[in-house]
UniProtKB/Swiss-Prot annotation:
It holds the Pfam family Pkinase. Expressed in all imaginal disks, higher level in wing disk. Residues 278-287, 447-456 have a biased composition (Basic and acidic residues). The active site is at D125 (proton acceptor). SUPFAM superfamilies: Protein kinase-like (PK-like). PROSITE patterns: PROTEIN_KINASE_ATP, PROTEIN_KINASE_DOM, PROTEIN_KINASE_ST. It catalyses: L-seryl-[protein] + ATP = O-phospho-L-seryl-[protein] + ADP + H(+); L-threonyl-[protein] + ATP = O-phospho-L-threonyl-[protein] + ADP + H(+). GO terms for biological process: germarium-derived egg chamber formation; intraciliary transport; negative regulation of BMP signaling pathway; negative regulation of smoothened signaling pathway; positive regulation of nucleocytoplasmic transport; positive regulation of protein ubiquitination; segment polarity determination; smoothened signaling pathway. The lineage of its organism: Eukaryota, Metazoa, Ecdysozoa, Arthropoda, Hexapoda. ATP binds at V10, G11, Q12, G13, S14, F15, G16, C17, V18, K33. This is Serine/threonine-protein kinase fused.
Amino acid sequence: MNRYAVSSLVGQGSFGCVYKATRKDDSKVVAIKVISKRGRATKELKNLRRECDIQARLKHPHVIEMIESFESKTDLFVVTEFALMDLHRYLSYNGAMGEEPARRVTGHLVSALYYLHSNRILHRDLKPQNVLLDKNMHAKLCDFGLARNMTLGTHVLTSIKGTPLYMAPELLAEQPYDHHADMWSLGCIAYESMAGQPPFCASSILHLVKMIKHEDVKWPSTLTSECRSFLQGLLEKDPGLRISWTQLLCHPFVEGRIFIAETQAEAAKESPFTNPEAKVKSSKQSDPEVGDLDEALAALDFGESRQENLTTSRDSINAIAPSDVEHLETDVEDNMQRVVVPFADLSYRDLSGVRAMPMVHQPVINSHTCFVSGNSNMILNHMNDNFDFQASLRGGGVAAKPIVAPTVRQSRSKDLEKRKLSQNLDNFSVRLGHSVDHEAQRKATEIATQEKHNQENKPPAEAISYANSQPPQQQPQQLKHSMHSTNEEKLSSDNTPPCLLPGWDSCDESQSPPIENDEWLAFLNRSVQELLDGELDSLKQHNLVSIIVAPLRNSKAIPRVLKSVAQLLSLPFVLVDPVLIVDLELIRNVYVDVKLVPNLMYACKLLLSHKQLSDSAASAPLTTGSLSRTLRSIPELTVEELETACSLYELVCHLVHLQQQFLTQFCDAVAILAASDLFLNFLTHDFRQSDSDAASVRLAGCMLALMGCVLRELPENAELVERIVFNPRLNFVSLLQSRHHLLRQRSCQLLRLLARFSLRGVQRIWNGELRFALQQLSEHHSYPALRGEAAQTLDEISHFTFFVT
């Protein structure tokens, strides 16, 4: 690092931080990516170093060049060329591009992606944040290969990394994937460049996944026929029907705008991604550099199941430069060579099947499918999308270029920012917005320093030192390291994608760094005292709350630490202070941004699951059966563990009923974390016994209340509740016959809501025993509120024909 002078932090993500720096020898401006070695196995670091060597060999005018890489005891440093701005920020500032500028940028991306695929490298994290631009609007791809997180034994949270805005349907549908997944993402980026927003937008991850899998793209009427044909080929949901490289390179939309080096043509013929007739060859490529690259790829140790040499990407580092950075010169387009398209005899123009792509919006649904939720037990109105349906029909062949007034463009830019999901959901990481909050960082450092000097018992070293050495967004790095699928899976012949819904994010012990539980308890106790004294500033700052939340992602945190975190974060809602009412909204917004609800749920599942395998076992190749972690039942838990789980879910329950953003995060987390298993584990307990622990009753009551809230406020997510309530393991009658008023009353409420939103499911479980249990509660119970609830439930269900069965 002595050769470089670091000037500023320009980006941060799941893998590390990106700094702008100047090389002292020649004053060249570079970007330095710092990747922490913390929590990484030796095998992971070995593969990471080899990937650096691979990237150093990649040379293309539209691929960010790696200058060098080196490492210290704690970090790996990757030095690359520096770019002015990314496409996401450009679109945020300027709105949608015209078709000509977008065509130019798309040509650059096609050139770069073709180069990667020619070298058997999949990107699989294509999005505007990974497209960097210089002052001349020359685009360069970044964050591939090296960016892949090497952690083993993880599936779920990796799959919906950042957001699935640009993920191909086959990935979301848990189908095998190949290079066609990159083609879909390329189409999403090109679409967003011209439309101002991605093809599919939603405020909920679950809703977004359903849209990508089932809804058709809405085409703006401003697109020319060439442009629409190009996008239709890329945004074909069936990867087998998606446009091929042969067709893409000859498409009139990008014809004449693609750069292919002469030496690349031979490599493209040998790559199965770019040439469908290519066979895997054991010999080196004819070109020496390509041969060296293939040799390096083959040397990667990915396990015995490897059958393909490819590299995939899963990074989300946003190398966003500030507006005052120097301009870079990458004038390549002016000196572009003649494009040589390999196997061009299979021209796009000769394929009538592609030319006959449907130009009409035709949603594919049947009479038993809910358009919004895909839930056959619900009937919901058809929801309109971003573009007018009739306008899309009328504008199928219009060739007019979009003319956007500056005011409209600015409005669209703001709307784009609002509509897009946080690009750093990354395993429930901290989202600090689109820029680095330097003031918040400064305050965090000052507070930590003052705390150190004023207290004899210093705060936890793990929390404070790590927080000061990395941006706040890096605090949840332990979880992020574990949220990626196995290398063996990525390199298998079928390329089986990570499991989406449901799944378990198996965070093995190696991904949870040692934690000083006693120091954490002292730190949390001091923080509680500060809140009781009226000092609320710490809970209004993202980075400080992220420090407090960090133990929730660490499997080595003891129950007392987790319970103290929940109690500390609950205090603002129970303190009676007129001034607090003003601050409460700020605190709630911070809780939303740091994804507190999913973190609490994740902590509870870590707490209640059986301990993970040893580090050596966790590093071994995983089978399907080893991916799921079993949960302990109520009799297997200690009183302290039950009390802790209850504290976690009581806070979740309060937040979910407080604000819909928390409810949306809860629904996403239930699906992503497969929390239905945890719910079933508790609700299947026999609460008819008199020895049921009070904490277990409160916890089960929270779960029933949460499911009722989902049905009331977000009925389109009723399927999440159905998976739990209608599971054969759950006997709903036993809940109605519980010895506890709370469980009986909330069970009646839940059943009434299910009859409204999941009637077919209620009909399946309805029987005489269930009807008798409700009648007993409505006629003979001494508790008036419960008796009234049961009577109301019976009254509503009695109107249906299956009631008497």
